[in-house]
From Swiss-Prot:
The lineage of its organism: Bacteria, Pseudomonadati, Pseudomonadota, Gammaproteobacteria, Pasteurellales. One of its GO terms (biological process) is chromosome segregation. Pfam families: KicB (PF03882), MukF_C (PF17193), MukF_M (PF17192). CDD domains: MukF_C, MukF_N. Its main location: cytoplasm. The keyword Calcium applies. One of its GO terms (cellular component) is nucleoid. It comes from Histophilus somni (strain 2336). Interacts, and probably forms a ternary complex, with MukE and MukB via its C-terminal region. The complex formation is stimulated by calcium or magnesium. It is required for an interaction between MukE and MukB. Disulfide bonds: none annotated. This is Chromosome partition protein MukF. GO terms for molecular function: calcium ion binding. Belongs to the MukF family. Keywords: Calcium, Cell cycle, Cell division, Chromosome partition, Cytoplasm, DNA condensation.
Amino acid sequence: MLETSQTIPELVNWTREREFSLSLSTERLAFLLAIAIYNNERLDGEMLETDLIDIFRHISNTFEQSAETVSTRANNSINELVKQRFLNRFSSEFTEGLSIYRLTPLGVGVSDYYIRQREFSALRLSVQLSIVADEIQRASESAEEGGDEHYWRKNVFAPLKYSVAEIFDSIDLSQRMMDENQQHIKEEIAELLTKDWQTAIASCERLLDETSGNLRELQDTLNAAGDKLQSQLLRIQDCVIGHDNLYFVEQLIVDLQAKLDRIISWGQQAIDLWIGYDRHVHKFIRTAIDLDKNRVFSQRLRQSIHHYFDHPWFLWIAQAERLIDLREEELTLREEEALGELPEELQYESLADLHEQIVETMQSLLIEYRLQNTPIDLSEVLTAQLKQYPLANHFDIARIIIDQAVRLGLAQDDLNGIYPNWRSINENGAEVQAHVIDKY
């Protein structure tokens, strides 16, 4: 995000002294967005007051407001946008009564937030990452050639600071816009399901699939370019090792690496969260369908009982085996058919029994860790626990342990946005990607 050399008290006092305030109603915001669109269509970027009044007249008609007071309300809206520094007004004695208006950086930023930042696609992301790769490539080549401090500031620091960092910030902002878009889709799905869920199932499926596809496509693009960008940054970092006068370059490299890790990490986390929401919606739909069938059956049964003496009937009850639910969240351990009888020591244990045993084991381990104030290395815990169970049960055991560990603690490195490394947890190639849990 944006770096600043000012402290929080300085910014607070600066805002207080200038009496900054922002307040945009829906009508005023629509007016500002219309001004921004109109401004983009003009070559000079300047607007007259008559242009703004015409734009406001269209807004007023859209909001079905009175046409008799358009001029007065337009002047009030224009003055309010000028007061809040969304518009700049220019006038002189030579142009008395004829003012010229231009959007301020604040006006451009707010309108850009609502208009352009939603245009986030894999193509745009690919272009941005391509530009970043070229800039970092040139900066790494310049770093390997070397030079004085002025050379480093011009050929290495400047491209990274004012091109690469800004594109990273743009990608980060776009991700936050996608987060907001996901919330909007969730609200839309909730509204569909509360109105008429039977006809809304297809629409819900489409929204879920489109969002999942977009998230995966964008994350694949990030993953494909992430390693290459990190390797180029490491090349530059190697060149500044041992040069104390180039501390500003080293600090910038560290910041860029953290930003890139944070972008990639949140992209993957957003996918995982959306998968969980997808399962939740499908579970709700399944439950709703089952309940609806039960309501129809119970209604017909009540009617049949009520008219039994007029239309006698017989009732047969049958219980069919449940079909396998591919979206079932509660996984079970693998059951294999066996011939003959087994002693009690080898009888099959249910997942619930294993879950209780592992929870007790984890609790006893965590008590020791808390008393000794020792971080929990999840890979070591998994390795030790998996040795006690057959290979066929490793996946379920690991899932239970990870679920308990995540509920009981977190890692400081996760909060810092550091990407964890893969570590082996058994002899058959299974790996886990998790930081050491050091906060309970």
